[in-house]
């Protein structure tokens, strides 16, 4: 059995004296592990870092075996990502989210969103907006997608500013006003189709977005598995909070 595919390194662990087991999120083969001979060597260390993109060739005698990888770098992001605290936390959190997906189950949209997010970590606000969208995409892939297209009460597609914490559906301003204290806020960048790039956010939008996705991830995905939010998620949000508090450069 063998295949070749694009992949992003999620994690690496040493195996024996010189090998490493590498976990990738691939475009067409999902989250997939394989052994890299010599992967524990100093020569391989710069390549085998979370966030780097590779061309992976996998080979095994049987499909269910761990198999062996040969990896070729296509984009080396790790050195840049290690230069900022929000990126370090963000990459770790993204990997923890990807691990919620079944192993070897293709999720091409998740792969594409991961690439988009990793490539925009130089701007902390844009990266945060992408990460919130990534969490929404994980919810959808696992069967718990939110319906943010129209008001659950009226069917209106305008002034959608709330989300029901029970149904995960959008609620318009007029329909939600009497229960505003019980509803979650829907950030502007999640209700504006033109904001897919991640631009157009405010600090409050980001906090509202993490509150929104965090509520549904915890209730629908993590708690049923006996898990909680990753420490890296909290670290990322704290790093974003500090960045927002810094004085703007003149």
From Swiss-Prot:
It comes from the Bacteria. Involved in DNA repair and RecF pathway recombination. InterPro entries: ARFGAP/RecO, DNA_rep/recomb_RecO_N, NA-bd_OB-fold, RecO, RecO_C. Belongs to the RecO family. This is DNA repair protein RecO. One of its GO terms (cellular component) is bacterial nucleoid. The gene is recO. GO terms for biological process: DNA recombination; double-strand break repair. Keywords: DNA damage, DNA recombination, DNA repair. NCBIfam families: reco.
